[in-house]
Amino acid sequence: MTRSEKVEIIAKLEEGFKASEAIVVCNYRGLSTKKLEELRNNARENNVKVQIVKNTLANIALNNSGKTGLVLKDTNIYLWGEDQLSVSKVAAKFEENNDKFEIKTAHIEGEVADVAKVKALAKMPSRNELLAMLLQVWNAPITNFTIGLNALKNKKESE
């Protein structure tokens, strides 16, 4: 890889890392190409970027984008995106289904996060799910009132 290619990779990573709310670093050693493609497809569906990069290049891009503190060792695959829940869910779900895939560390909301925080975020409902729950709670009194009125109407008609 030439120096100009490295500079280009660093620039692209830096741009992506600056715009991201979450970066998850994972071990992918031993995964087949088919499994990696499955991860990429799942990530693409959830607006999450996935890339395998040398640690030195990733470290430079992370430092240039202000995301410091991550300790990068061995082979890593990087997942990042604007929505921290999506990034966490993609990584955690893929880890559950693949023994050779392991979440190592993350950088979420400007600070280094451990595996437990990533998994906790993955369990949280998405924004759309939360809105659906809220609407369900708001509609419950109206629904119950309507059911009560309908029951009263049926009772009056049967008398």
UniProtKB/Swiss-Prot annotation:
Highest taxon listed in the record's lineage: Bacteria
GO molecular function, one term: large ribosomal subunit rRNA binding
Gene3D superfamilies, sorted: 3.30.70.1730, 6.10.250.290
SUPFAM superfamilies, per the entry: Ribosomal protein L10-like
InterPro entries: Ribosomal_uL10, Ribosomal_uL10-like_sf, Ribosomal_uL10_bac, Ribosomal_uL10_bac_type, Ribosomal_uL10_CS_bac
A GO biological process held by the record: translation
GO cellular component terms given for this protein: large ribosomal subunit
Keywords: Ribonucleoprotein, Ribosomal protein, RNA-binding, rRNA-binding
Signal peptide extent: none
Disulfide bond positions: none
Any Pfam family: Ribosomal_L10
Record bears the keyword Phosphoprotein: no
NCBIfam families registered for this protein in UniProt: PRK00099.1-1
Membership in a protein family: Belongs to the universal ribosomal protein uL10 family.
UniProt function note: Forms part of the ribosomal stalk, playing a central role in the interaction of the ribosome with GTP-bound translation factors.
Assembly and binders: Part of the ribosomal stalk of the 50S ribosomal subunit. The N-terminus interacts with L11 and the large rRNA to form the base of the stalk. The C-terminus forms an elongated spine to which L12 dimers bind in a sequential fashion forming a multimeric L10(L12)X complex.
Protein name listed in UniProt: Large ribosomal subunit protein uL10
Lineage of producing organism: Bacteria, Pseudomonadati, Campylobacterota, Epsilonproteobacteria, Campylobacterales
